[in-house]
Curated annotation (Swiss-Prot):
It is found in: Secreted; Target cell membrane. Plasticins have huge conformational plasticity. They can display random coil, alpha-helical, beta-sheet or beta-harpin structures. The modification Asparagine amide is found at residue 68. This is Plasticin-C1. Residues 25-46 are annotated as: Disordered. Residues 30-40 have a biased composition (Acidic residues).
Length: 71
């Protein structure tokens, strides 16, 4: 009977260890996915900011040239 108890405890312990390892890997994968999403969001914001700055500069030049032409 003692042999069965020890075997059962060993099986439970190994199961808990493997479950813990799986949970840790899952957390790492989720962190990596979140980091990738954050990087993509930053890239999109940077791209949008660049487009808006360029459009603003072009619009400013156009208005400036129109106001100079009217004088």
């Amino acid at each position: 009977m003692a042999f069965l108890k020890k075997s059962l405890l060993l099986v439970l312990f190994l199961g808990l260890v493997s479950l813990s390892i799986c949970e840790e890997e899952k957390r790492e994968n989720e962190d990596e996915e979140k980091q990738e999403d954050d990087d993509q969001s930053e890239n999109k914001r940077g791209l949008l900011s660049g487009i808006l700055n360029t459009a603003g500069g072009l619009l400013g030049n156009l208005i400036g040239s129109l106001s100079n032409g009217e004088s």
